[in-house]
């Protein structure tokens, strides 16, 4: 007799690092390998919309999303700002991983890190490679200061062809990074979106994500205050540490196979810097993929290609 598949679709609250934190777990068969997804930001979790983009991924993996400490459904006014450090997030990630492995009776899992989450992933992989089969680095952050400078130059080049445009005016107004004022950062991110190199390459896709967050069961309007408060809280206490990160010096080697995925149009984390890190990284195996129709969120913008890419390079169980 062929055993029946046992699907799963749950929200699970855990006590992680002495704070309540929320997981969302989905898959068609709990016997499939686990995939833990570390969201970007800091402070921009995906639980509110991501289920719309991972149906194919759930055929191959039991997919776990986690609203990290101080963000989204894991936000609380009681969380100490002293705990909002990369080191605490690394410990949280390891604790979440160990709970998942014990709960599902697995020895290892697959780890995906997107943007800010890719910083956490590199540190976790460096400390506990024994817990993971393969790492999927999506829009891999390497050196935020260099990435910002590179993106700014790309935007200036685009704006030069449109000298009378609002883009040209704004890039000249803020000048080159580093920027000291919040308004300069806000204008810069607006310029990134104008050039279609931001969250998604197609603005319609970003609007769809917002609609899904507002109308979905996971967040909805009732929980948007937690999302927004968590976003402000996370950025306030983690941004300085984020900008000090340099993967070239901090994580020159990883002891697990690595697959890097970058969007061709990404101007938040330009592909050339991620690819330079990929080329210099010491790892037992590594692959590089560029998604031609994506900006910063290839797993959302091209979900079928993303699912196929991950499943093809999951060497264990699939």
From Swiss-Prot:
It is an enzyme of class 3 (hydrolase). The active site is at 115 (nucleophile), 266, 296 (proton donor). It holds the Pfam family Hydrolase_4. The keyword DNA-binding does not apply. GO terms for molecular function: aminopeptidase activity; hydrolase activity. InterPro entries: AB_hydrolase_fold, AB_hydrolase_sf, Hydrolase_4, Peptidase_S33. Its EC number is 3.4.11.-. Coiled coil: none annotated. One of its GO terms (biological process) is proteolysis. Keywords: Aminopeptidase, Hydrolase, Protease. It comes from the Bacteria. PANTHER family: HYDROLASE, PUTATIVE (AFU_ORTHOLOGUE AFUA_2G14860)-RELATED, MONOACYLGLYCEROL LIPASE. Probable aminopeptidase. Belongs to the peptidase S33 family. This is Probable aminopeptidase YbaC. The lineage of its organism: Bacteria, Bacillati, Bacillota, Bacilli, Bacillales.
């Amino acid at each position: 007799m062929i055993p029946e598949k046992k699907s799963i679709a749950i929200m699970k609250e855990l006590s992680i690092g002495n704070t309540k934190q929320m997981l969302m777990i989905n898959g068609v068969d709990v016997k499939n390998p686990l995939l833990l997804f570390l969201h970007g930001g800091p402070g921009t979790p995906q639980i509110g919309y991501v289920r719309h983009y991972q149906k194919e991924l759930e055929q191959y993996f039991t997919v776990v999303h986690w609203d990290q400490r101080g963000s989204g459904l894991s936000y609380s006014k009681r969380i100490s700002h002293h705990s909002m450090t990369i080191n605490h997030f690394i410990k949280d990630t390891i604790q979440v991983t160990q709970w998942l492995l014990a709960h599902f009776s697995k020895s290892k899992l697959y780890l995906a890190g997107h943007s800010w989450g890719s910083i956490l992933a590199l540190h976790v992989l460096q400390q506990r490679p024994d817990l993971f089969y393969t790492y999927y680095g999506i829009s891999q952050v390497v050196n935020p200061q260099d990435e910002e400078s590179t993106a700014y130059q790309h935007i200036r080049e685009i704006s030069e062809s449109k000298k009378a445009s609002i883009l040209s005016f704004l890039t000249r107004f803020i000048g080159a990074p580093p920027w000291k004022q919040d308004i300069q950062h806000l204008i810069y991110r607006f310029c990134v979106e104008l050039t279609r190199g931001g969250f998604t390459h197609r603005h319609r896709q970003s609007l769809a994500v917002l609609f899904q967050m507002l109308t979905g069961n996971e967040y909805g309007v009732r929980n948007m205050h937690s999302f927004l408060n968590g976003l402000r809280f996370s950025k306030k206490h983690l941004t300085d540490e984020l900008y000090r990160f340099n993967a070239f010096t901090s994580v020159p080697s990883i002891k697990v196979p690595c697959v890097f995925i970058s969007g061709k149009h990404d101007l938040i984390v330009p592909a050339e810097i991620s690819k330079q890190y990929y080329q210099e990284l010491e790892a037992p195996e590594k692959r590089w993929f560029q998604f031609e129709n994506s900006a910063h969120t290839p797993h959302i913008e091209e979900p079928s290609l993303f699912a196929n890419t991950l499943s093809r390079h999951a060497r264990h169980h699939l």
